[in-house]
Amino acid sequence: MNNKTEKKGQRIASDHISELAEGEVFVFGSNIQGAHGGGAAWYAYKNFGAEWGVGEGLTGRTYALPTMEGAASLQKAVERFTDCAAQHPELTFLVTAVGCGIAGYTPAQVAPLFKNAAALKNVYLPQCFVELL
């Protein structure tokens, strides 16, 4: 299992995460109600302990990031995620292409929100975000 790579100082999360190593956290897009009914949210719920009804934050071996409540809300949620990742250097956060599925955003819209998170050594972003930063 290799869920992450480093190339030229860039930390890249795998596009296909089926299991997690010790200390790895699966970061997925959610809705604020925590109804994890589809996409990566459903996968996180079924496989990594995301709690139904929790729409933001650490649960199980996951971090729920609400993406369905609008761009301004998403920006604030990413800021809170970045703060959480900074407070937990013992964890490795593997970010999926949050917001780019059911929520309907493009990587070009979401990637810039992760600029500060990308500077953290324990945050790995999807290739489609890294290419835009």
Question: For the regions a protein language model found, what residue spans apply to each?
Answer:
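Macrodomain-like recognition of ADP-ribose-binding/processing modules
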Residues: M1-L133
